[in-house]
Every structure is written in C-alpha cells, then in structure tokens.
Amino acid sequence: DPLLEYSXEAMEISYTAPNSSTYEPPQIRNNQLIDTILNELLNVQTNYTMGLVNLLQNFIIPLRIQVLSTGIGSDMTRINQVFPPTIDEITRINCILHDSLNKVSRYGYVEIIRVVGMILPYFYKAFIRHEANLKLYTTRLNKFYSKNSKTIFSNNLINKGNYSTREIDSIVSGSLLELPKFKLILKRLHDAIESEKLKKKNFENFVDNETSIITYYYNTAIEVIDAFGGCQGSEDRKIDSQLRVFTPTGKILTELATKWPPELQYGWLSRKVVGIYELRNVKPKSFFDLEILIIFSDHLLFLTIIEESYYIRKKNEPIKSLSVSDILMHSLVNEKPLPVLSLLPSMEVNSWCNLNEVITSCYLGVSSHTSSKQDFLRFLNVSKSGFKSXXLDHLIFTKNYEILRSKENKYLSGHKIIELINKAKVLYKNQLFHLFRSTDSKITYLLNCS
C-alpha cells in the first residue's frame, strides 16, 4: 500500500531571511491586535508541531525500534497500519515551517505571511495522504490497544510519554484541523492589516508598498487550505443534469472534465482510483500537451488540460503551486468535494481504454523542454480498436508521454507508474490468478492469470 510507505515530498525552495541591507520593516508597527494574532499563529503552529514530534519521539519510534529488533516484517506492517508513516511526513513539513517561522518572527507580518505562503503548498500532499490513512482510525487504534495494552502501552521503555489512546487519537487525527485553524487566523490577520492601512490612508499621506506581496502569498496559502478542505466557491460550473455522472458517494465526475465517456458512468460500486499523474504528451495534436492520467482499477483515462492560462502560470510560477493530479487524488480517494474550481484548469477527456488492453513500458529519453534525460512512458493498446476517444478520426494504438520533472514529482520514475498499473490489474481480478515477480529488477511484474 503506497499510503503505508514513507514518501516525503522533495523541497526545492527554502526561506531565506532578509539581510539588514535589503530588509524593509512592515509599514504598521507596534499594533497590539496584529501582534496578538501573529503570536496566536506561531503558538498554534508550535503546539501542533511539538505534539507530533513528542508522539514520535516518546512512543512511535521506540515502538518501531522494538518491532524491528524482533526481525518479523509482518509485525512492522501491522504497526504501520496503526501508526502510518504519513505521521512522519506531516511532522517533517510542520518542523520545516516551524523552523522558518522562528527565523522570521522578529521581522513582522509581511515576512511571516511570505513564509506561510511559500511552505504551505508542501502541506497539501502530506495531509491528503495522511487523511486517507485515517479512515476508521479510532477503531483500528482501539483494537490495537486491546491486544497490546500490557506489552506496549504499559511498557515504559516504549510508551515513554505515557500516552493513552485518547491522546494519540487527538494528536494523529486532530492534526487535520491545523489547516482550517490556519485559515481562520490568517483571515483575521489579513483583515486587521487591511483595516489599519485604511485608517492610515484616511488620516495621513500613506503610500502602501506591501499589499501586492501580502495578497499574493496570502491567497496562495488560502487556496491550499480551501483545496484541502473541499471549500465550495461561487464559481462552480453549471452542468446539465442529464450529463452528470455520480459515484456511490454522490460525487459528480463530470465536474472534472468535459466529454466524459458513457461507459464509465457505470461500475462505481467496485471501481477504485489507484493513481493520478500529470504527464506531457510527446506528440500532441495542439498546443495543449499536458495530460492527466487517471489509473482506475478497471480503466485508464487520459484528460487533456485545455486552459491556456494554466500553461502560462505553470511556466512563470515563482513558488510551488498545487498539482492538478494531487487535487483530483484528494477528491477521489478521500471522497471530498472538488475545491473552488478556479484551482482546477479546464480539462476534457482525450482517450480511455480497458486496463487489460494496455501494455506499459518505460524508456529513458531527452526532454525537448528541459534538454535533460528523464523517464518516458509508452502505452501500447493490444485490442483491435485501440484507444477509445470521443473525437476518433483514426485508430490510435500507442501513446507516448514524458514524466514531468517538477517540484511536485522530481523523483517519480516510470517504473513506479507501471507498478501501480499492475497493482490496478490485480484489483480488477475477480477470479484466481498467479502472480510472478521477475528476478530482473528492470522488469516490474509479470502476470499469468488462470
């Protein structure tokens, strides 16, 4: 299970505090309300960070060490199901933000908002993975406690912090409330700053030279939080009720893209989402070359991003922005409504096929965009009709894609995607089969179904 593997997101940016020659102090100083809100923001973030750090140091890590010393791999798997590595992921990114906020706290509200806007996008992937692990978490934790009360929870060498199940649940599950709390505090901070500036403009010659910076990083932070919480805005696209496609949870899938294939309107009682990736089409039919690959347990679906502003924004973005694939993964896996649709570019279904009709291979090539070597994927459709498409003018049997080397998936390999496609094929089976793994590490899996 990919959710039970530690998969921290690489960060290519880090906050650098201003030096004395370039630093410009905030235009509003010694304001009690603003200072109080800033202190609240720092205290809330510190409390969440220290709660997670202490739980890891005083319970989870000693427990893992104890289990690893026994040499029984199945025991570690069971431990990871109750204390998943996503706890480590959200602790890591909280520590990074905590360290940056400590460095910047003396510089005032402009730099604090800048830090939050720069680092909060890296919270998104860690938190959606963590939320996916928390389904029925309290039940799993209580069951684990009932079986290991004396050997683990009453063992002072393991439970150094003397944690109860209620405290553990509060820290692990309660961590998801951090982002909504951030939003409330950031909104109060932003409103307080704007209110004080308005007063200055009314009673003195006041030239505002920091609003553009504050607004940019504030909006970036709020967009991340809204995307995580599934905040619905007033920009929802109006969809013909006859064209809507619903999953069992009531999700309207035609919000994702236009030209949704009719054959995917059915089968949602057993269909699962295995993975979602953003790729670049090697031979696009138009300027729009970025596509979203959705790996279902029974189909592969390719969505083309057809919004020109998205390509411009992607090229010129100064800091990390939310990945379309991550937003969709959060919505489909964690059963959350789609966020404000301005976060999602316009998309349309390019093509689709049955999962068992495709052979996927990986090869190394040179990117025409970066001039560097990276992985490419080749999808070969072995059916007589090839890939299906809403605007099919000729048969297509092969599709080639470049795996984007970006801040979001710099270390993603083609073999990882192939492995997930093979796992999806296993999920799709409804009869007995044999599973073989090659001794050659270059070959991921071989399937022989009976």
Curated annotation (Swiss-Prot):
Cell cycle as UniProt keyword: yes
Organism superkingdom: Eukaryota
Keyword Cell wall biogenesis/degradation applies: no
Record protein name field: Bud site selection protein 3
Protein keywords: Cell cycle
UniProt similarity note: Belongs to the BUD3 family.
Listed InterPro entries: DBL_dom_sf (IPR035899), DH_dom (IPR000219)
Gene Ontology molecular function, alphabetical: guanyl-nucleotide exchange factor activity
Function: Co-assembles with BUD4 at bud sites. BUD4 and BUD3 may cooperate to recognize a spatial landmark (the neck filaments) during mitosis and they subsequently become a landmark for establishing the axial budding pattern in G1.
